[in-house]
């Protein structure tokens, strides 16, 4: 049964040994206890297996530049310094590419001293090449909310490829709550893999998380006429420029051909990423997240500046899991090249999937009864496009 947020306050307490990510029912209890506040009522489906969807407020501020408030300044104070104009989101408005907007969120926090939080774009947001991060008052980092934080939350939004139509209540980001440290090290990850087979690779590397490579062969590679190598399979999509607007609430409303160019495998198993272009690719490996765990995709090498992989990094309990309707799912990779052309090769490691324990198994798993868009996925665009 899906956890929803009731109006009656309930106590939220933990044993000393309770470390990890809060599941859906504990997120609901945290809200009921006053740890998560909202200007308007919470809505059905807002609580996910290991996260809470965050909703945009009624106004967006276009600002001159992205910023962090720093340890002594609030976000509102920085908005006053950098604001160009306001955009009313009540009935919907278009956020243009190349612009930076700050939107106060409907949710705010009054966290207990032992609970911290982390935010990330939702999958559909990242697949639209919408760069979004959550900011809290008096902080030095994006998407990171310190334990015990009391205050508002804001979304920084910068559409990179497609202009987007958003409105009050649109959900572009999600937030996880955690108590203590429960990330699995290489030994614990290897032991879990021996039981659950987390990845369909015989030579899986667990150092720093499960290594994830890029698939440049495609699901149905075609043999070449000379009998060597492979080629021809669909490996991904490259975003088109100067397209129409994408309404973030419109599911299956857009023709893929109007927004994306399909890309097919090359015989040499390489792909040249063009500067400042956006690609949707898939992982070579199929992965799964068992019910008692959550995962996050992190960069393989944060110092590698040639391209960025995966805006939206959260993987919920049950992702790709056989008991939740999956058969192992491939991670969809949102890839943006930077200043120079860069060649990537089939199987090249582009990220690592870091696993973390849940404090308890969620009531609802990804893919079971929550309308999950990407369970048992292969290469897949966001839910906005009909295929």
PLM region descriptions:
Residues 1-387:
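DUTPase catalytic domain/fold
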């Amino acid at each position: 049964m899906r956890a929803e947020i009731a109006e009656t306050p309930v106590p939220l307490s933990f044993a000393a040994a309770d470390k990890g990510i809060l599941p859906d029912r504990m997120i609901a209890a945290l809200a009921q206890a006053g740890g998560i506040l909202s200007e308007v009522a919470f809505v059905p489906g807002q609580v996910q297996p290991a996260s809470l969807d965050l909703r945009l407020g009624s106004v967006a501020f276009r600002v001159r530049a992205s910023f962090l408030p720093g340890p002594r300044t609030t976000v509102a104070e920085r908005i006053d310094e950098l604001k160009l104009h306001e955009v009313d989101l009540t009935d919907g408005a278009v956020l243009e590419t190349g612009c930076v907007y700050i939107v106060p969120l409907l949710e705010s926090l009054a966290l207990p001293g032992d609970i911290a939080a982390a935010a990330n774009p939702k999958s559909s947001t990242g697949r639209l090449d919408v760069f979004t991060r959550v900011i809290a008052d008096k902080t030095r980092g994006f998407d990171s909310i310190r334990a015990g934080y009391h205050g508002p939350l804001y979304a920084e939004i910068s559409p990179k490829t497609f202009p987007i139509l958003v409105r009050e209540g649109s959900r572009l980001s999600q937030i996880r709550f955690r108590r203590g440290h429960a990330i699995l090290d290489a030994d614990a990850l290897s032991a879990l893999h021996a039981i659950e087979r987390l990845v369909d690779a015989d030579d899986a590397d667990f150092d720093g998380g499960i290594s994830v490579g890029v698939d440049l062969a495609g699901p149905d590679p075609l043999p070449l006429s000379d009998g060597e190598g492979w080629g021809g399979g669909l490996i991904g999509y490259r975003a088109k420029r100067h397209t129409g607007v994408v309404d973030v609430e419109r599911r299956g409303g857009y023709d893929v051909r109007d927004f994306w160019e399909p890309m097919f495998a090359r015989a040499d198993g390489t792909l040249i990423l063009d500067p400042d272009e956006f690609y949707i690719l898939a992982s070579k490996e199929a992965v799964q997240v068992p019910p008692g765990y959550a995962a996050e995709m992190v960069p393989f090498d944060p110092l590698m500046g040639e391209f960025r992989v995966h805006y939206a990094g959260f993987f919920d309990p049950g992702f790709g899991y056989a008991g939740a309707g999956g058969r192992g799912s491939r991670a969809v990779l949102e890839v943006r090249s930077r200043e120079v052309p860069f060649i990537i090769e089939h199987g090249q490691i582009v990220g690592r999937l870091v696993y973390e324990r849940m404090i308890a198994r969620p009531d609802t798993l990804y893919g079971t009864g929550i309308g999950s868009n990407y369970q048992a996925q292969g290469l897949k665009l966001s839910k906005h496009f009909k295929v």
